[in-house]
């Protein structure tokens, strides 16, 4: 059995903790065989556990506990990931979705999509990454009073260009710079911008969406000092025809949305900056969670 989960890019500027898209970088978890102990083979570095301390297996345990279920066996697993760690592309969310599905398959829980999403939001705390990782495409979601509501839609046709800096930025560190509250007038403005962003994405109006993406009041202004590449790449985007540029998740990845015919030009102009990191040309993933050779 093989579980495949896409990376995600959250917030899209003003859609803070609510809007996200799935992109075509993937985490894969393969069940190899039964084993005396849980063991995960991976090449993700020494800081990532290979035993039950791994997020994949702590998630599995949390799901089993929540559903009053258990497993009679332990397994040898293989985990491979194209998703850069701690870069704002939903690496932890992809593992959480994989862990939920691993529990679903091995314990034959027959979870619905809604149940999987509720579990993911309980573990992750907010839906902006886990929802598109599960569902694919564009997802706009809200979790209030332990209930998650969402709208899923195709994303407007465009190219995605992600600059992934060489340094990590943990979400907990990136959240420390955010204010504890916003003034009422600023909150109203921030909300109205997010409303127009949502409407423009759902009506495939990327020109307006790009303007709203870059008008965020919720988080980007506070995080900009942590990711100096954001200002540089946004200016390049303005000069050479991008729809909009935003901080992906908590950063430090910077994502540009652009017309198809601007991809080569913007790639060239960004590479000329000699920034320390990698540039990825990405597409929106429309599948979300996939299971090959399901045991259900």
From Swiss-Prot:
The keyword Lipid metabolism does not apply. Disulfide bonds: none annotated. GO terms for biological process: threonine biosynthetic process. Coiled coil: none annotated. Keywords: Amino-acid biosynthesis, ATP-binding, Cytoplasm, Kinase, Nucleotide-binding, Threonine biosynthesis, Transferase. Gene3D superfamilies: 3.30.230.10, GHMP kinase, C-terminal domain. InterPro entries: GHMP_kinase_C_dom (IPR013750), GHMP_kinase_C_sf (IPR036554), GHMP_kinase_N_dom (IPR006204), GHMP_knse_ATP-bd_CS (IPR006203), Homoserine_kinase (IPR000870), Ribosomal_Su5_D2-typ_SF (IPR020568), Ribsml_uS5_D2-typ_fold_subgr (IPR014721). Transmembrane segments: none annotated. One of its GO terms (cellular component) is cytoplasm. Pfam families: GHMP_kinases_C, GHMP_kinases_N. It is found in: Cytoplasm. Catalyzes the ATP-dependent phosphorylation of L-homoserine to L-homoserine phosphate. Belongs to the GHMP kinase family. Homoserine kinase subfamily. This is Homoserine kinase. The gene is thrB.
